[in-house]
């Protein structure tokens, strides 16, 4: 018979392994072979395996600070993974760590990589997006809160549609409608992510992917 103490030891190690296991990265499928991956733990969150022809990855390094060793791992991974038929769109901003930004500047000179973001002190992307820092942060956080990714790419996604039915709706009923039924304000547009999305769709339209 196995002693109770053995069960306790086994339970302890199982709990320790569960605690040590990294959380799965936040990913979203944007369609047409485009996948978004938010990098919060480097290098653990980097996708594994070789590139798939026709697949494009958006890797989001915004607000991530990583050490020199992690940045060096990213450099090796990008050099192995990036190519013109399976490009990498790398999102960064002024708050991305200095070691990571140094790597991004280096890989941007190669083929198959495009660095995209809102310019700021010490950060000049290849493809610039326009956004205020507070709006960018709010849009970035909205995805963590569970907002649909497409709502961060489309202007006024929550705007009520004005059609014949709404025009014929009795005014009295409109006045009696509870405030809770009001249209939910749309989250801010994620300008950098939107820029990457539009670039991908343009390349697809030109049959370059």
Give, region by region, the residue ranges found by the protein language model.
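Bacterial N-terminal signal peptides
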Residues: 8-18
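C-terminal "post-core" interaction segments
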Residues: 22-209
